[in-house]
């Protein structure tokens, strides 16, 4: 299965991209501040030493959300910055923290096609069963994006194939791509065969 090309945004447009991604959040409350926390800004800029100094100062809240409820780890996931993600997790942040729309860091990484960060979060024990506000799990999103690189990774990591979103759809039901459907069916058949052999 070939990987799906995902458009990457250069670092100069990171803040603008953030604002566009969260534009819907502004509609929740006209009085809600849209000012980005300083730690979030530092993570967007991608300077690990600056982020480390801020965290080590003890003057920042590692679980603070922006106006959309995105925590620092969500931002590290969006930027694909493993060094920052590692440091945040080592400081005890919640790997499965949810924003205002139920999105966890691994869901953010999947949406952005941040393959290495997804693998990193899996290695640290991210929950693959948690869905967003629409109950879409990481595998649902990878299938929706037709991400041929992430789908095998998520399947191998044990993503639930029978998880249903709010439309009562399992991951295989959110695509019409025959190659993806065939791949998931073959994976499922192989897993079932392996389980049968283990039971003998």
Swiss-Prot record:
**Which keywords has UniProt assigned to this entry?**
ANK repeat, Repeat
- Repeats (ANK): which ranges? 34-62, 68-97, 101-130, 134-163
Note whether Thylakoid occurs among the keywords: no
InterPro entries associated with the record: Ankyrin_rpt (IPR002110), Ankyrin_rpt-contain_sf (IPR036770)
Query: Which domain of life does the UniProt lineage start with?
Result: Eukaryota
Q: Where is this region: Disordered?
A: 1-34
Q: Which Gene3D superfamilies match?
A: Ankyrin repeat-containing domain
Q: What is this protein called?
A: Ankyrin repeat-containing protein DDB_G0279043
Return the Low complexity bias intervals.
9-34
């Amino acid at each position: 299965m070939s990987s799906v090309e995902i458009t990457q945004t250069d670092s100069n447009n990171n803040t603008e991209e953030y604002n566009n991604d969260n534009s819907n959040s502004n509609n929740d409350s006209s009085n809600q501040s849209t000012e980005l926390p300083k730690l979030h800004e530092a993570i967007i800029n991608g300077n690990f030493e600056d982020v480390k100094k801020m965290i080590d100062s003890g003057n920042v809240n590692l679980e603070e959300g922006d106006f959309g409820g995105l925590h620092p780890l969500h931002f590290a996931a969006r930027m694909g910055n493993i060094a920052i993600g590692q440091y945040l997790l080592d400081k005890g942040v919640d790997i499965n923290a949810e924003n205002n729309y139920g999105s966890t860091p691994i869901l953010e990484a999947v949406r952005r096609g941040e393959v290495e960060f997804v693998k990193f979060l899996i290695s640290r024990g991210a929950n693959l069963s948690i869905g967003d506000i629409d109950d879409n799990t990481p595998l649902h999103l990878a299938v929706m994006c037709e991400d041929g690189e992430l789908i095998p990774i998520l399947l191998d990591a044990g993503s639930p194939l029978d998880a249903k979103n709010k439309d009562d759809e399992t991951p295989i039901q959110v695509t019409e791509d025959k190659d993806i459907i065939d791949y998931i069916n073959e994976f499922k058949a192989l897993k079932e065969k392996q389980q049968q052999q283990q039971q003998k």
